[in-house]
Amino acid sequence: MVIIHGAGSRKENHGDFGRACAAAGWAALAYDQRGHGASEEEMGPAALGDLGRMARFVGSIDDVDPDRVCVRGSSMGGFVAIHGAATSDAIRAVVAICPAGEQHLLQGLRSGSLEMRAGPQARAALEAWLGEHDLRQAVELLGAKPLLLIHARGDERIASEWSEELYRHAAEPRKLIVLPGGHHHSAQHDAELQGLSLRWLERTISN
């Protein structure tokens, strides 16, 4: 399992899911996206390639089946997870929690509310790259790769209707969970949902 955080976050914030993976017998890797945490790089379009490399690395670990490497991304991490899975054969399935669309990321980038380290050139490159991508199309490109979408109805940053729209673009196997209430960060740290995610992945990637 490759775990991808959102904007303004870092890998340590998802340690609870990493521990849940380990307890369920999954190898798990969380990393700092560019422009975050201990990463020395500025955030930019190369972030997508980083995910593919991380997935291949996890698949190369002893006792890890390279055909069962999955990704879980939250918010901006959900955007990267879906696009990464749509373009990399190293990724088998996706869990996206309150995934941000390119429109949400562009709005945050232009308003300055998107927390990340990126200078003017990096921000310009990121804005141009986001303008060329559509998360709905990426969902369609997943084809038969399993997609689990989780969203809190009370999300104050990204409306849950966005995940409902993405779900309509997804092929089977797919699953959408919309939680009553909550907020932008509540679903990613819910222990029950973490267990449900892993069980759903086990069932779908074993078929």
Please tell me what each predicted stretch does.
Residues M1-G6:
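Short beta-strand element of the alpha/beta-hydrolase
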Residues A7-R19, Q33, E41, E161:
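The serine-hydrolase catalytic nucleophile loop
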Residues N13, E42-D62:
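Alpha/beta-hydrolase active-site loop
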Residues D63-S75:
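Alpha/beta-hydrolase fold nucleophile elbow
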Residues H83-A128, S186:
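Hydrolase active-site cap/lid region
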Residues L142-G143, L149-H151, D155:
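Short beta-strand/loop motif that positions the catalytic acidic residue
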Residues E156-W162:
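Conserved alpha/beta-hydrolase "acid-adjacent" motif
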Residues G182-E192:
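Catalytic histidine-centered segment of alpha/beta-hydrolase-like enzymes
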